C-alpha cells in the first residue's frame, strides 16, 4: 500500500527543482499522487476498507491544498505539473 524508498527517490529525482530538493511542492504532490494511486488500486479488491478510504480522502485534500498553492503562485508550473501527473484541473 505504501510506496517503496526506491520509487520515492525516483519521484524526487524526476520532480525536483534542484539536486537536493526533497520538499518542494511539486515533489510533495508527486509523492502524494503515487500514494493516492496505490490506495485506489487497493480499493478495487478491498471495497469495505473504510479506514483506508478516510486516509485516501485526507491525502487527496492535502494534495489539493498543495496544488492550489502552486496554482496561486505560478500558473504555468501548475499546468505543467498536472499534465505530468495525469490529474484534472482544480476548479
Swiss-Prot record:
| GO cellular component annotations of the record | cytosolic small ribosomal subunit
InterPro entries tied to this protein: Ribosomal_uS15 (IPR000589), Ribosomal_uS15_bac-type (IPR005290), uS15_NS1_RNA-bd_sf (IPR009068)
Q: Which UniProt keywords apply?
A: Ribonucleoprotein, Ribosomal protein, RNA-binding, rRNA-binding
Q: Specify whether NAD is a keyword of the entry.
A: no
**Any one Gene Ontology biological process term?**
translation
Keyword S-adenosyl-L-methionine present in the record's keywords: the answer is no
Please provide, alphabetically and separated by semicolons, the GO molecular function terms listed in this UniProt record: rRNA binding; structural constituent of ribosome
Q: Which residues form the signal peptide?
A: none
Would you say which domain of life the source belongs to?
Answer: Bacteria
- Spell out the coiled coil positions from the record: none
- Protein family according to the UniProt entry: Belongs to the universal ribosomal protein uS15 family.
Q: How does it assemble?
A: Part of the 30S ribosomal subunit. Forms a bridge to the 50S subunit in the 70S ribosome, contacting the 23S rRNA.
Question: What the protein does?
Answer: One of the primary rRNA binding proteins, it binds directly to 16S rRNA where it helps nucleate assembly of the platform of the 30S subunit by binding and bridging several RNA helices of the 16S rRNA.
Per its record, how is this protein called by name?
Small ribosomal subunit protein uS15
Task: State the species of origin.
Answer: Rickettsia prowazekii (strain Madrid E)
Query: What's the source species' lineage?
Result: Bacteria, Pseudomonadati, Pseudomonadota, Alphaproteobacteria, Rickettsiales
Gene behind the chain: rpsO
